[in-house]
From Swiss-Prot:
One of its GO terms (biological process) is mitotic spindle assembly. It is found in: Cytoplasm, Cytoskeleton, Microtubule organizing center, Spindle pole body. This is Mitotic-spindle organizing protein 1. Signal peptide: none annotated.
Amino acid sequence: MSSTQDEAILRNARETIDSLYDLSQLLQTGLDKSTLSICVGMIEQGANPDTLAAVIKELRSENEALNSQSNA
């Protein structure tokens, strides 16, 4: 692949992540661009989106519980 093609692929990927991030912000998911990129990559590799969402929710819940314990 030529460098021009590589640049076009990278630009397209950035634009896609930017669009997904904008949508993520509208939906108030709380995901930053880095986390969103990781999630997209995992889904592209075959991860189940519903399962991934459940894991993220569980991790957030556990994090909140730990923060509550440390603040008590």
